[in-house]
């Protein structure tokens, strides 16, 4: 059984004070989570403060990025062991904003994913197509190629720790959302690709999230789709009321 994962990606928002206020509000309304997981991914500067608040709570902690070396002269970067040490269990890998603004290639995303796994972190690896690619009918081959590249040399026994997030680039922060049917079709294509790579039994265990303008008013229909196993939430995770409604989808 795939346990749904709702993850809040706070991007470059929230000071330490703002982050702790938000987490306290989330914890106050969270309750017990018996059939789903929820995590927040604050900016690096707030990780320690948030880690202290969520310890021994149902709310988990993730990071938004890492550098694929354990240590070294890499000014400005953060390593997998540093994230583990601070209390992270998850890390977002290859978000479209990293690919677009910082030139991260499929090969570099693969390095990051394997580094995360090697240090006991669970990567949330992001894939998705642009609007021109979708309009040209290339969405599925683009996305499945990203999946194959991200998972290069990842052994079958590690796939239980991998989460894939399908985020159509044209839907991120725009208010546009893929229809539940379109999202389901892409999730099914991703799962079929996983079956080609690892067999249907392993493919059936991998969680595939949807991301891209996830909101309280569309989460229920998205989560009703058979291959959608959670959500990677941006703007709607920055307010307690909206994120709690998403976490408590019906």
Curated annotation (Swiss-Prot):
SUPFAM superfamilies for the chain: Triosephosphate isomerase (TIM) (SSF51351)
Pfam families given in the database record: TIM
Predominant localisation class: cytoplasm
Locations listed in the record: Cytoplasm
Name assigned to this protein: Triosephosphate isomerase
Domain of life: Bacteria
Annotated catalysed reactions: D-glyceraldehyde 3-phosphate = dihydroxyacetone phosphate
Organism: Chloroflexus aurantiacus (strain ATCC 29366 / DSM 635 / J-10-fl)
